Amino acid sequence: MAISKASIVVLMMVIISVVASAQSEAPAPSPTSGSSAISASFVSAGVAAVAALVFGSALRI
């Protein structure tokens, strides 16, 4: 059974939205701490880039 590219992108979006909601519920880190938390905007930009690569390879413009 082949998994379509659209279902992979939807699965990635669901996972990222769950992670982003978990991060938004967590308390904010101290300004002096060196935490390397990934912002939800960076994650969504990464998803957009991956989706462009996945669907861009199928499109011939």
Swiss-Prot record:
It is a lipid-anchor; GPI-anchor. It is found in: Cell membrane. The keyword Hydrolase does not apply. A lipid is attached at S35 (GPI-anchor amidated serine). The modification Pyrrolidone carboxylic acid is found at Q23. Residues 36-61 form a propeptide. The keyword Ribonucleoprotein does not apply. Residues 1-22 form the signal peptide. Keywords: Cell membrane, Glycoprotein, GPI-anchor, Hydroxylation, Lipoprotein, Membrane, Proteoglycan, Pyrrolidone carboxylic acid, Signal. One of its GO terms (cellular component) is side of membrane. Contains 4-hydroxyproline; hydroxylated on Pro-27, Pro-29 and Pro-31. O-glycosylated on hydroxyprolines; noncontiguous hydroxylproline residues are glycosylated with arabinogalactan. The modification 4-hydroxyproline is found at P27, P29, P31. Belongs to the AG-peptide AGP family. Proteoglycan that seems to be implicated in diverse developmental roles such as differentiation, cell-cell recognition, embryogenesis and programmed cell death. This is Arabinogalactan protein 15.
